[in-house]
Regions:
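Charge-rich, well-structured scaffold segments of protease-associated domains
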Residues: 1-52, 65-93, 98-217
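Short amphipathic
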Residues: 55-62
């Protein structure tokens, strides 16, 4: 596997910044690429078809020998969201994640916390894969809270889908992301690295679309 796929012929190289591009490409060739022969690598993939019904998976993890097993359950609700080549959906779910779960007073997180489902609620939007996955996780919950977790989550999402989201909440999320991207504020990570990773979210799946998510910025 490693010998087949971990090869320059199956790699993506990008340069970021004000530079002499020819100089850097020559350097990369002389110090890296020239030592390999080009070869054809089939790294194609097929989309996973939607499930015909909800799938429930139960797994176990270890706790300390002297730790109680009470309130150590992690409940996770997950759904595939389109594909990463849909730029509007990609950005839209970043906004929704902020509004519904991450922002102060986020309504769905608040509903779950008010019901004391677990000790904390986390959400994630994994859009770095072809078929992005949105997840909601209740941490350190009780075993018997699974049904209530699903019920409250689906009820609140259905209510929001029907009644909509207050305009001020959406504007706050828009402002949050506009500031983040205009200022290239990626915390401890250099912006050149983060731009590259964001390019890969589409470039890996369509050679003609490396910049669709960068253009959003």
């Amino acid at each position: 596997f490693h010998k087949t796929y971990y090869h320059p012929s199956n790699s993506y190289i990008y340069l970021c910044g004000d530079m002499d591009v020819d100089e850097y490409l020559t350097f990369i060739d002389e110090h890296y690429l020239k030592d390999f022969d080009k070869k054809q690598i089939d790294s194609s993939w097929e989309k996973q078809e939607p499930f015909t019904e909800v799938k429930r998976v139960e797994e176990y993890y270890p706790v300390g020998e002297n730790d109680s097993e009470e309130e150590k359950t992690y409940l996770s609700y997950n759904a595939v969201i389109g594909d990463s080549l849909d730029a509007k959906l990609y950005l839209g779910f970043e906004i929704l994640n902020r509004v519904l779960f991450d922002a102060p007073g986020a309504p769905v997180k608040k509903a779950l916390m008010d019901a004391q489902i677990g000790k904390d609620i986390q959400s994630s939007y994994d859009n770095g894969i072809m078929q992005p996955v949105f997840s909601v996780i209740a941490q350190e919950a009780r075993d018997d809270q699974e049904d209530e977790f699903v019920k409250i989550l689906e009820k609140n999402l259905a209510k929001i889908a029907k009644e909509g989201i207050p305009r001020r909440n959406l504007l706050a999320a828009f402002n949050y992301y506009e500031f983040k991207y205009r200022e290239a504020n990626f915390g401890r990570f250099p912006k050149g690295l983060m731009y590259g990773l964001q390019m890969y979210d589409s470039w890996l799946y369509d050679d003609e679309k490396p910049f669709i998510h960068i253009k959003t910025n």
